[in-house]
Amino acid sequence: MTDFFFEYIFPLIIIALKVVAITIPLILCVAYLTYAERRVIGLMQLRCGPNVVGPFGLLQPIADAVKLLFKEPIIPINADKILFILAPMITFILSLIGWAVIPFSKGVVLADINVGVLYILAISSLSVYGIIIAGWASNSKYAFLGAIRSSAQMISYEVSMGFVIITVLLTTGTLNLSGIIEAQRTMPWWIDLMLLPMGIVFFISVLAETNRLPFDLPEAESELVAGYNVEYSSMGFALFFLGEYANMILVSAMTTTFFLGGYLPPFNISWLDCIPGFFWFVFKVGFLLFCFLWIRATLPRYRYDQLMRLGWKVFLPLTLFWVVLVSSVLFYTDNLPNV
């Protein structure tokens, strides 16, 4: 019995504790990211933002959560009730399970699998299903149009994101996310410089993937009222909201891992190794999240045809050309990784 416990039950308990240790801080980060967004945008617009609930407004996310929790969940009479309820759950759960392969520091990762990049791509591709189901199940033309926009937008930018990730794989030679970070420790500076344009393309693409300004067409208030979540209230709306912000943190972590060295110190400065890698990871993710908020506060929304044109006529040929360029340069300089 003891052998059975230590061989089968104990590993499951350890995995469950690791999941809780990642999920609870992540949900708190999502809650306070909404607070940070309102404060940053308020300061950029020369106003205070939330500053009443608690000192400096720090209890505002808790007040918002309590308000949404006690609101009445209203399901439209013609909606597909089961799918209507499942859609926000799918969106929120998929935004959390992507964190299983993200390395927070050296050796600190829930599942250090050798196909981590494929896992992340699969999860990011599945996340659109929650939005499509919500648009269909709501039985509303605004919600359905928002869902169609979201699916077209994600398909358009997944292609260029895939080519960008191929350039990263060409330089690192591994699908393991920890391996990608460690490969950047010894990577020549000119390869980092060659990947810089792809890092910018990747960041713009994840703006479109997460439906953030200037690409928030699926929920454009002036055109679609609120898009795919127009019929949602109470915790259904809250789960969509949490899913969007959890996705923001996830794609910031992906960008950090692929292009900013993950938990490595900036520019591989050796005397900064004394600072824990987790600090550098959080610092880089926080910087990218600030860029998300900065962009929302400063840029206007694209038209839908401009969004599609950027994805298919600019990013797709550019990333395809860059894959050929990077592979050619690495081949002729004999810097292709040994796999």
UniProtKB/Swiss-Prot annotation:
Record PROSITE patterns: COMPLEX1_ND1_1, COMPLEX1_ND1_2
Annotated catalysed reactions: a quinone + NADH + 5 H(+)(in) = a quinol + NAD(+) + 4 H(+)(out)
MF-aspect GO terms: NADH dehydrogenase activity; oxidoreductase activity, acting on NAD(P)H, quinone or similar compound as acceptor; quinone binding
Source domain of life: Bacteria
Membrane topology field: Multi-pass membrane protein
Subcellular location: Cell inner membrane
Assembly notes: NDH-1 is composed of 14 different subunits. Subunits NuoA, H, J, K, L, M, N constitute the membrane sector of the complex.
Family: Belongs to the complex I subunit 1 family.
This protein's name: NADH-quinone oxidoreductase subunit H
